[in-house]
């Protein structure tokens, strides 16, 4: 199936096209892919029993694609990820970058991978940073499964997906120079007087009283 018509490239924001992807059908879209562009590709991909979509972009681009596939119940589509530069997502999923990532996206095999989402139904690919409003300290209490992550005030709470189970890991930022402690689990939950969440570099200006990131009941198919 490799290099067949079942494989399509979604090029985001004019990203440079690696040599390994040059011969594949390609669609152009914005930095954050428009759902209409994704929807146009789905019938083409659906014509094959093993559809594969390669996202050429950054973490926010991949998160947008996965969010749409999750909401439309199309997580059977194999996803290759080709970031131009290192990202939190490329580290978490060990995809590599540039042409090395492109070769893996074309020739690799799909691996069931935990899909991490938040309570708004948005997928997280690389990293979420949660702070107080205006970048102030974050006040509240957070847990990863049953283990307390913090209670009180911290500079920020960091949440990241994992390549394997249990799926989610979280830590806090403090003005203390020491190795960061990560807690792993199925879900990371925060209760707070007010928090602002930045997902994969995209800030949400809404001040929230709570935030949760957790493993979706269905995995996604990452080509590795």
Predicted feature residues:
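Catalytic core of DAGKc-family lipid kinases
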Residues: 3-22, 29-49, 56-201
């Amino acid at each position: 199936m490799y290099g067949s018509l079942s494989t399509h490239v979604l090029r985001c924001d004019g990203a440079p096209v690696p040599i390994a992807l040059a011969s594949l059908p390609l669609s152009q879209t914005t930095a954050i892919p428009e759902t209409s562009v994704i929807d146009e590709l789905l019938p083409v991909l659906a014509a094959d029993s093993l559809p594969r979509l390669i996202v050429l972009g950054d973490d926010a681009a991949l998160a947008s694609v996965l969010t749409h596939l999750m909401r439309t119940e199309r997580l059977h589509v194999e996803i290759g990820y080709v970031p131009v530069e290192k990202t939190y997502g490329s580290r978490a999923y060990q995809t590599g970058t540039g042409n090395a990532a492109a070769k893996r996206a074309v020739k690799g095999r799909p691996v069931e991978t935990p899909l991490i989402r938040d309570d708004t139904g948005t997928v997280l690919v690389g990293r979420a940073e949660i702070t107080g409003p205006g970048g102030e300290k974050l006040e509240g209490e957070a847990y990863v499964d049953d283990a307390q992550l913090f209670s009180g005030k911290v500079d920020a709470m960091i949440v990241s997906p994992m390549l394997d189970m249990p799926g989610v890991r979280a830590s806090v930022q403090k003005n203390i120079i020491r190795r960061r402690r990560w807690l792993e689990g199925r879900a990371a939950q925060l209760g707070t007087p007010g928090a602002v969440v930045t997902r994969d570099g995209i800030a949400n200006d809404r001040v929230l009283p709570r935030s949760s990131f957790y493993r979706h009941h269905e995995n996604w198919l990452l080509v590795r």
